[in-house]
Amino acid sequence: MTWPAVWAIVRKDLASVIRNRGVRIPLLVTPIIILVFLPVLLVGGGELLASSGTVPIDAVGASPLDRVADPQLQERAISAVPPAARWAVFVLEVFLAPLYLLVPLVVATVIAADSFAGERERGTLEALLHTPTRDRELMLAKFLAAWLPAITVAWAGFLVYSVLANVLAWPSVGRVFFPTPTWLLLAFWVAPAVSALGLGVMVIVSGRVRTLQAAHQIGSLIVLPVVLLLVAQLGGVLLFEPRLVAAMGLLVWLLATLALRIGAGSLRRERLATRL
């Protein structure tokens, strides 16, 4: 393994991401919306309305919970939480948990699409093929160039979200309650796996399309399972709890390994050369 060559490709790809506004904006906007804007809007806005007396949310029956969550889900997730804190805890612990997975997924897929399909569209793929690296090293470099930023953004966002969650919920909860074991598993077990799976899918997709736009359009379908998880949880079909999240992470890692093995075939020089 020629590590200097691997890191040279990683640095080149990261520099391209920083220069490319079309890639840079989604990397910033997605975590800000999910991990900052939504908590402030849903929890901060609810606390403000409650304190002003405009909307009573001190009981589950008078809160927005009945309109967004299945009663069985409420019983399983927040039955032990004081009534005044149920809305805040539900939003921060339950509702936003599946959406958090969109952060590493979007970051990984956006960078991967630019790294693979973008190289072909910009006409820089041919030069890359002439670098003194083996196919395995090229695959590793491309993987690290997207996976490392994805988990960095996911973990930095998790840290910011943890502080923000405790600040927003303090008026009703009255203590530091976050992060929970479920969220720790999401951040450090599932998020890296989701990033790897997104990368594997984008490698497969990018090997079969010629434009960055096409890669984005097809690759965007990978967010659908996350949306289905959110709907299933709100419907009471499942609840993100430690054992389920641990098992889900294992499944995602297995799928990611399979996708990356399939995608590795798309990065062989002879196949890339035929698609220039």
PLM regions: where:
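Membrane-embedded or membrane-proximal helical elements that form or frame transporter/channel pores
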Residues: 48-107
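A structural motif at transmembrane helix-loop-helix junctions in multipass membrane proteins
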Residues: 19-25, 115, 174-223
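Transmembrane helix boundary and interhelical loop/hinge segments in multi-pass membrane proteins
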Residues: 17, 108-127
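Short, membrane-interfacial amphipathic segments enriched in basic
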Residues: 1-11
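Hydrophobic alpha-helical transmembrane segments of multi-pass membrane transport/permease proteins
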Residues: 4, 19-52, 71, 95-108, ...
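Membrane-interfacial helix-loop-helix connectors in multipass membrane proteins
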Residues: 55-59, 86, 160-188, 237-240
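Junction motif at the cytosolic side of a transmembrane helix
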Residues: 208, 254-276
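Selective transmembrane-helix segments that form parts of the transport pathway or gating/packing helices
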Residues: 103, 108, 135-162
